Design a protein with these regions (language model features):
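Conserved alpha-helix/loop element of class I SAM-dependent methyltransferases that forms part
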Residues: 34-57
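Conserved SAM-binding loop of SAM-dependent methyltransferases across substrates and taxa
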Residues: 67-78
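Conserved SAM/SAH-binding beta-strand->alpha-helix loop
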Residues: 87
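Conserved SAM-binding loop
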Residues: 94-95
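A conserved beta-strand element that flanks and buttresses the S-adenosyl-L-methionine
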Residues: 130
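A short glycine-rich, Lys/Arg-flanked "PGG" loop and its adjoining helix->strand segment in the class I
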Residues: 142-154
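Conserved class I S-adenosyl-L-methionine
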Residues: 157-198
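Rossmann-like AdoMet/SAM-dependent catalytic core
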Residues: 211-317
C-alpha cells in the first residue's frame, strides 16, 4: 500500500493549484449559485432518494468538504455542518461561501486530514456522515470508509459517493495515453489532455460547471486515482455493519417494476447486475477516437490498441 501521507501531500499539492470543487461565484445574485444549488437538490431528491427534508435539524460531518460549494446546499436545507478539509485554502473559501449563503456561526470548519481527525471525540456524534469524490484520491479507501462510518450515530446515515471503477478504467487508459505522450511535465499533461479529450472535458464542464483546467487537474494531473466498484462499496458497507441502499443509477428489470438497486436485502443480485452495467458502460468510448488517430507520439497507438482489446474482451464475456 502506498504511504498515506505521501499520497495526501501529492494530492494537496495538486488541489492547491486548481480546486476542482469550485462550481459558482460567491455572490448571492449570481445565477451560477442557483444553477448549482438546483442540480444538488435534483441529485439528492431524485438520484439518491434522500430529499432535502431529511437534512432539516440533523447534524452532518463532511469529510473532504473542499470549498464547501456542495456542502452549503445541505446546510441551507437545515443541516448543522462540520466540514473537514486538509487544504487550508479551500477551507477559507468554504468559510466565505457559508458566510454568503448560510449562517456561518452555526457550522464548524476543521483543517485536517480525514485520517487525523479526533476519532474518539467525534465517534457516533453525527446524524449524517457524508463524503463525496474523496476516497478515490486516498491510499487506503477501506480505512477511510471505516472512519467515515464510525462518525455516524446508531440509526444515522452514511452518504458516500465516488467515481465508479468502470469510469476509472477509462480514465486509467486515458492517463496511459496522456503520460506516455506528455511525461511528467504538468503543462504538457494539460495540453495533451485538452488535445486528446476535448469532448470529454466539455461534457464534464456542462454536467458540473467549472473550469476546463479544473477538470483536467481532477482527472489527469492528479497522481492518486483508484476508483471503487459497486461491489467494493457494498463490501465497505457490510464490513461496517451498515445497511446498504442505492437508488442511482437504476436497473429496472422487465416484469419486476422495482430496481434491485433499491433492495437492501439483495446485495448479491445487485453485484451481478452492477457488473453487467459497469462493463456495458465502460465500452461506450465513442467521441475521442478521431482525436486519438490524429496524434502521433509515443503511447498513443498503445492506448488505442488497449481500448480495442478491452472492448473485445468484454463483448466476449
Amino acid at each position: 500500500m502506498k504511504d498515506l501521507k505521501t499520497v495526501e501531500q501529492s494530492t494537496l499539492k495538486t488541489f492547491k493549484t486548481h480546486r476542482p470543487s469550485e462550481y459558482f461565484k460567491e455572490k448571492e445574485n449570481d445565477k451560477s449559485f442557483n444553477v448549482h444549488d438546483k442540480k444538488v437538490e435534483h441529485l439528492y431528491r431524485f438520484g439518491l432518494a434522500f430529499p432535502p427534508e431529511y437534512f432539516r435539524g440533523r447534524t452532518l460531518i463532511d469529510l473532504g468538504a473542499g470549498t464547501g460549494h456542495h456542502t452549503v446546499s445541505l446546510a441551507r436545507w437545515g443541516a448543522k455542518c462540520t466540514l473537514v478539509e486538509m487544504n487550508d485554502d479551500a477551507l477559507d473559501v468554504a468559510r466565505n461561501v457559508f458566510s454568503e449563503f448560510s449562517e456561518v456561526e452555526d457550522h464548524h470548519f476543521i483543517n485536517s486530514s480525514l485520517y487525523d481527525i479526533d476519532k474518539v471525540k467525534y465517534r457516533e456524534k453525527f446524524d449524517i456522515a457524508h463524503s463525496r469524490g474523496v476516497l478515490t484520491h486516498v491510499a487506503d479507501k477501506r480505512g477511510a470508509f471505516e472512519i467515515l462510518a464510525s462518525l455516524a450515530k446508531p440509526g444515522g446515515y452514511v452518504i458516500y459517493g465516488d467515481r465508479n471503477t468502470c469510469g476509472g478504467i477509462q480514465e486509467m487508459l486515458q492517463r496511459l495515453a496522456v503520460y506516455s505522450y506528455a511525461g511528467n511535465d504538468e503543462l504538457q499533461i494539460v495540453n495533451v489532455s485538452e488535445k486528446l479529450f476535448s469532448d470529454d472535458i466539455e461534457r464534464s464542464v456542462l454536467s458540473v460547471p467549472r473550469s476546463r483546467e479544473a477538470v483536467i487537474y481532477d482527472r489527469w494531473v492528479i497522481r492518486q486515482q483508484d476508483d471503487p466498484s459497486i461491489s467494493d462499496v457494498i463490501d465497505f458497507f457490510e464490513e461496517n455493519n451498515l445497511l446498504y441502499v442505492n437508488s442511482w443509477p437504476r436497473i429496472d428489470f422487465l416484469g419486476r417494476g422495482v430496481s434491485t438497486f433499491t433492495d437492501p436485502n439483495n446485495n448479491h443480485a445487485l453485484k451481478q447486475g452492477a457488473f453487467l452495467v459497469e462493463n456495458l458502460w465502460m465500452i461506450l468510448n465513442d467521441g475521442e477516437s478521431e482525436n486519438i488517430k490524429s496524434l502521433e507520439g509515443v503511447g498513443i497507438g498503445e492506448y488505442k490498441n488497449l481500448l480495442v482489446t478491452v472492448a473485445n474482451m468484454l463483448r466476449n464475456l
